[in-house]
Amino acid sequence: MLNIAIAVFIGGGLGSVLRWLISYRLNSLFPHFATGTLVANCIGAFIIAFGIAWFSKAPNIDPIWKIMLTTGFCGGLTTFSTFSVEVVALFNEGRIGWALGTMGANLAGSFLMTAFAFWLLREM
């Protein structure tokens, strides 16, 4: 059990740092749109889908790597809570169009990246 907690801790730390770097670099490009959150969520959706599909095809890989990648890394990288706060803040500021656009972009982007990852691994 301790080794699983350590794996989640390491993966989560790495994913969180990557999310911070992405947001740090991208959020200043478009002040009215949280580009960093969108990119982090889409990358995370791709990685977790690709990882789950990959691990299902490679049963000999130690399951600790799966938990480190999915729960740890992708859990640290993706952020539903930040996405929610950003959307509610936009609604509270009266920027309804931006709020709806942010919701649509995050949901559609994440679903599309998930589907793309599954398709890509199937084609490999």
Swiss-Prot record:
Regulation of its activity: Na(+) is not transported, but it plays an essential structural role and its presence is essential for fluoride channel function.
Q: What is its main location?
A: membrane
Q: Which cysteines are joined by disulfide bonds?
A: none
InterPro entries, per database record: FluC (IPR003691)
Database matches in HAMAP family: FluC
Q: Which family does it belong to?
A: Belongs to the fluoride channel Fluc/FEX (TC 1.A.43) family.
Name-wise, this protein is Fluoride-specific ion channel FluC
Protein source organism: Proteus mirabilis (strain HI4320)
